[in-house]
Amino acid sequence: VLAGYSVTVTAGGSVCWQTGWIESDASSVVYGGRELPVGVPVEVMVSVRNRAGEESGEAWASFVVGLLPKGAHAEWITDGTYTGDDTAALYFRREFTVRRELTTATLYCAGIGYQSVTINGTALSDAHLDPAHTDYTRLISYTVDVLTSMELSPGTNAVGIAVGLGWRGGKLPNGMVPSFFGRPMLWALLVLRYADGTVETVATDDRWQVSRGAITSATIYD
């Protein structure tokens, strides 16, 4: 039976909250530390002990705090020539420069219908149905990827994002045309945090390239 716990929360190498041992049988605990940074991996370590004083090993979990509205400065972009009869995927690309030593680099991405993200030609994930489907007129999900030094290098780098229609368009078996149908669109924000404390962002805007590619049809049924 649970009799006590210890929780330590760290972010960017510094401790944000440390409870020490608390005598309690509570299975949920409200965070009581300092404000967690956005876009930086947060690690949580938990240990528990029973009434006999026997302690468990340390259990770890990690997460990234989501974007706040004040930090979400990027534009929705698409291909203006895309028509209602088109079903091809759109390919978006942007080069950027890593100028000095990074501490973290975080990519927030919402490609509707579905996206495939590469950094310097290497896929970030094997997921094929990101972001989660929603009614795009009301709510849009986004993904978060914390990039490593193996994925980014000093100098010129490139982010490429292919966006297929998915649930964004195409022909449904019943002939319906939902209100959330439309062109494939992309919203993305890459936040580069340097060791000297400076921050740079690479956001979707009119400087991104967009083109068609090898995928000529990418609806949910085709």
What are these regions (language model features)?
Residues A59-S62:
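Terminal edge beta-strands and adjacent linker/stalk segments
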Residues W76-T83:
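Short, solvent-exposed loop/edge segments of extracellular or virion-exposed proteins
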Residues G12-W21, G57, A123-A127, T198-T201:
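Surface-exposed loop/edge segments in extracytoplasmic proteins
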Residues V40-M45, N50-A52, V64-P69, Y82, ...:
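Accessory beta-strand-rich segments of carbohydrate-active enzymes
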Residues P69-W76:
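Acidic, His- and aromatic-enriched active-site or binding-groove loops in soluble protein domains
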Residues L2-P41, R51-E55, W76:
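Recognizes extended acidic, P/S/T-rich segments that occur
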